[in-house]
Regions:
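Conserved N-terminal entry element of GNAT/NAT acetyltransferase domains
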Residues: 1-14, 18-28, 134, 145-169
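Conserved donor-binding loop and adjoining core beta-sheet/short helix segment
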Residues: 6-14, 22-107, 114-119, 219-238, ...
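Flexible, substrate/cofactor-facing loop regions flanked by secondary structure
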Residues: 38-39, 150-234, 238
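Hydrophobic beta-strand residues of extracellular immunoglobulin-like
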Residues: 55-57, 212-215, 260, 297
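Acyl-donor-binding surface of acyltransferase catalytic domains
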Residues: 65, 72-160, 167, 294-301
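Conserved acetyl-CoA-binding loop-helix of GNAT-fold acetyltransferases
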Residues: 87-102, 245-247, 251-264, 268, ...
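Conserved hydrophobic beta-strand within the GNAT/NAT acetyltransferase core sheet
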Residues: 113-115, 240, 273-278
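Conserved active-site tyrosine of GNAT-family acetyltransferases
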Residues: 124-128, 283-284, 288
Length: 302
């Protein structure tokens, strides 16, 4: 049978692509695809444009998914996932992304696409350059890994601070406050029911474990640092996302402690390494090393 392209159908394709990413994961993320927890986190994130999910492209052969072209949060970005034997679909997948995943600029109303291509895929890099894409280094996304040591290093906190998790202390108002302030959205934190529900959906994704969602509580009980951690049992790895510290509590080692505690708990479950899609100093200090960069290329289509 021939390879067929069709539109994404939610929620069935959420599950099937989830399984696709797990099945084709190679140790050390050598496959270059998104790791499964990133796909899960995408669907719980409050910034996701869920109204456009149907525009995601799914390629099948004999009823098996062999490739996916998708965005992460909003139209205007494209990521590409492959069965290892179907990388010859690159050109067709880029065609699909330009037709269906393009965004429209706020200034001038021009159609554009940011295509994210791993720097260890020379064939795809050559393709996007030949089709008029230009590098946009500010959009590059590093993938980094941390080989979990044995014994695990001691985790220290300033006096009066403590580590906890959403399994032990699930307070969505505290979580929302820590993330809102931690991501520098301002001092006035909206606390309506819709905001708190969006945080619950963000962290209560299908395979999420509340015991891996780690918070640092200040002496007054408020959450002042937070690390959402995922464990993927088939690949035996942890994924760190998101991490934030309230501005007044930065440079105290709190974010680092939350990250390490999440990884430590994943190690107890069987993880031998952890991934994060960032190369910020906090991760470098812990010992994360770059695996590859997902290079950002931009093209204006109109």
């Amino acid at each position: 049978m021939s390879i067929k392209l069709r539109h994404y159908i939610h929620p069935d394709d959420y599950r099937r692509i989830d399984e696709f990413l797990i099945r084709h994961y190679q140790p050390g993320n050598a496959d270059g695809n998104w790791i499964e927890p990133a796909w899960e986190y995408m669907h719980g994130h409050p910034y996701l444009d869920s109204t456009s999910l149907r525009k995601i492209g799914v390629w099948e052969e004999n009823g098996e998914i062999v490739a996916v072209s998708h965005y992460e949060s909003q139209l205007g970005e494209a990521f590409f996932e492959f069965h290892p034997a179907y990388r010859h679909l690159r050109d067709e997948m880029l065609d699909h992304a330009e037709r269906h995943l393009a965004g429209v600029s706020k200034e001038g109303g021009r159609k554009y696409l940011h295509a994210f291509i791993n720097d260890n895929d020379p064939g795809f890099l050559s393709l996007v350059k030949s089709r008029g894409y230009e590098e946009d280094p500010e959009g590059d996304r590093p993938m980094c890994r941390f080989d979990i040591p044995e014994p695990f290093p001691a985790i220290t906190l300033p006096e009066g601070f403590r580590l906890t998790s959403l399994a032990e202390e699930c307070d969505w108002a505290k979580v929302h406050h820590a993330l809102w302030r931690g991501f520098d959205h301002g001092e006035d934190v909206p606390m309506d029911e819709a905001e708190l529900e969006s945080r619950r959906r963000m962290f209560d994704t299908p395979k999420a474990r509340r015991d891996l969602k780690i918070a640092v509580a200040a002496p007054d009980g408020d959450f002042v640092a937070f690390c959402g951690t995922f464990y993927e049992p088939a690949g035996k790895f942890a994924y760190v996302e998101p991490v934030a510290t309230v501005p007044a509590y930065r440079r105290m080692g709190l974010g680092k402690a939350a990250v390490l505690e999440g990884i430590r708990r994943c190690a107890e479950l069987g993880a031998s390494l952890a991934y994060v899609g960032n190369d910020l100093p906090i991760y470098q200090v812990i010992g994360f090393k770059r695996v590859y960069d997902s290079k950002c290329f931009v093209k204006y289509l109109t």
